[in-house]
Amino acid sequence: VGFKAGVKDYKLTYYTPEYETKDTDILAAFRVTPQPGVPPEEAGAAVAAESSTGTWTTVWTDGLTSLDPYKGRCYHIEPVAGEESQFIAYVAYPLDLFEEGSVTNMFTSIVGNVFGFKALRALRLEDLRIPTAYVKTFQGPPHGIQVERDKLNKYGRPLLGCTIKPKLGLSAKNYGRAVYECLRGGLDFTKDDENVNSQPFMRWRDRFLFCAEAIYKSQAETGEIKGHYLNATAGTCEDMMKRAVFARELGVPIVMHDYLTGGFTANTTLAHYCRDNGLLLHIHRAMHAVIDRQKNHGMHFRVLAKALRMSGGDHIHAGTVVGKLEGEREITLGFVDLPRDDFIEKDRSRGIYFTQDWVSLPGVLPVASGGIHVWHMPALTEIFGDDSVLQFGGGTLGHPWGNAPGAVANRVALEACVQARNEGRDLAREGNEIIREASKWSPELAAACEVWKEIKFEFPAMDTL
């Protein structure tokens, strides 16, 4: 046969519309915007090639192996409604292309060099189907939803949190004081801001000590289990682990990590440590909008959320639908359910391109955070349901009477909404009424209602289908 040098069309090798996908394949849905003049089949095949075994020219060493078991295949192409120059390319990757238990390796292949590819104007990974065989190579979340509820002894309602503000500039002792006041007032958790690591005005060890003191004092006074997400994110993995170890020595229930800026390798390491040592792991998604906000390029957040469930985390920030940060309702609900449910049906109206079976990998609690306050409580309770964490930063600390009354207001609002829902009332329609009724017997809630009655963050969402 001989070796035929030269450049040949990708579609001859990598576009295979007759391919039957295997249960073990990783499936990807890409939104492709080709350069003018590049046909869809060629662009789709190019994506499959560049993210698997292909290179730009025929190489002699192809003859030393069979590409068939290893190549990515573009097996289906469909137009995007309302967009002339875009289409969705479906690509199947054989399982053997990926290292077991490594989100890092999976992303290096699937969203690696191919995103800088010249024949494409833009490329966005919309969804991934992770096969059972690959899911089973991951530990996943350190504990999951049920274990967390059992550790905290809190059932039948969403959990309440609060990010301590001002996020930068407080001394450790004043920071601990704010933590204590919020927990004492009735919150379940307080949170280090994602940018709080170990800065000159507050070194991590001092913060950990004062926060631990705040946790134990508020626990003793309320009889409830309390937690503060101690941010273990650091400049090196060794420093990160040092912080996690110190948190364990203090006996606190939960630590935190910024998984995108910290990286998947660091995150998976920390998740393994957390399972071995009984720590819950709260995950913040700082940097996600750099990757997921553009509609035609990058990666959708639902893919980042799936990756986090594999890498490991017990809480993941997932937008709010009602606050100050991006999130269309149906789409947000799609990636609220993805991390926490065992089985998610394909549903294009929610942006879900594939049915995903998580085969008993523990679930992750979605966290609603960003510009929310007591008036949003009915909507949040209805949209997110019991298995969620609702975080009010400014919505707690901005209370006119102080932090503890701010916490009281949120807890009263939540308990009122949960009770109303359990009595069969419609939170979507009667939400404001429920909050008003509750505020009659809670002066703290009444004051909060007064402060935030006019606040709205109304901009059209970017994340549309």
UniProtKB/Swiss-Prot annotation:
Keywords: Calvin cycle, Carbon dioxide fixation, Chloroplast, Disulfide bond, Lyase, Magnesium, Metal-binding, Methylation, Monooxygenase, Oxidoreductase, Photorespiration, Photosynthesis, Plastid
Main location: plastid
Cofactor(s) required, per the database record: Mg(2+)
Pfam families listed in its UniProt record: RuBisCO_large, RuBisCO_large_N
Subcellular location: Plastid, Chloroplast
InterPro entries in the record: RuBisCO, RuBisCo_large_chain_AS, RuBisCO_lsu_C, RuBisCO_lsu_C_sf, RuBisCO_lsu_fd_N, RuBisCO_lsu_N_sf, RuBisCO_lsuI
NADP recorded as keyword: no
Family: Belongs to the RuBisCO large chain family. Type I subfamily.
Misc. remarks from the entry: The basic functional RuBisCO is composed of a large chain homodimer in a 'head-to-tail' conformation. In form I RuBisCO this homodimer is arranged in a barrel-like tetramer with the small subunits forming a tetrameric 'cap' on each end of the 'barrel'.
Complexes and interactors: Heterohexadecamer of 8 large chains and 8 small chains; disulfide-linked. The disulfide link is formed within the large subunit homodimers.
Protein purpose: RuBisCO catalyzes two reactions: the carboxylation of D-ribulose 1,5-bisphosphate, the primary event in carbon dioxide fixation, as well as the oxidative fragmentation of the pentose substrate in the photorespiration process. Both reactions occur simultaneously and in competition at the same active site.
The name this protein goes by in its record: Ribulose bisphosphate carboxylase large chain
Source organism: Morella cerifera (Wax myrtle)
Taxonomic path: Eukaryota, Viridiplantae, Streptophyta, Embryophyta, Tracheophyta
